[in-house]
Amino acid sequence: MKGGKSKTESKRADPKLAVNKKGAATKARKPAGKGKAAKDPNKPKRPPSAFFVFMEEFRKVFNKEHPENKAVSAVGKAAGAKWKTMSDAEKAPYVAKSEKRKVEYEKNMRAYNKKQAEGPTGGDEEESEKSVSEVNDEDDDEEGSGEEEDDD
């Protein structure tokens, strides 16, 4: 059987040509993870939804009524159940507070974005980008020229 291959041999893929699909998928994900920018600590936090505004108050009441219950999940489940039973009229104050915080957040974000846009163009950062040795070298050059004149 010089020229022909058996059916089982022809069905098998050449191991040298095989592509590791799992490895290729993980390799594709890695660069995306590296490119993720670090979070800016000065960036304003997103405003809470009406439900989370409700949760702030509900948590205080629930903890007073059930001091022995330390599970976060129990508080969340109880709050969710109560929120579902509330009418739109009962939810209205929380929605209003949420909208107020949203307007404040948008104002803060405009100020933050304006500050970010102005930041890189500022002249102060150019001086701070110089290393300490570069600044010291400039000072030494100025002092050195003054010392040479004293010797004359």
UniProtKB/Swiss-Prot annotation:
One Pfam family matching this protein: HMG_box
Listed Low complexity bias regions: 74-84
UniProt cross-references to InterPro entries, sorted A to Z: HMG_box_dom (IPR009071), HMG_box_dom_sf (IPR036910), HMGB_plant (IPR031061)
Superkingdom in the source lineage: Eukaryota
Assigned GO CC terms: chromatin; nucleus
Protein's UniProt keywords contain Nucleus: yes
Location of the DNA-binding region in this protein: 44-113
Family designation: Belongs to the HMGB family.
Protein name, UniProt field: HMG1/2-like protein
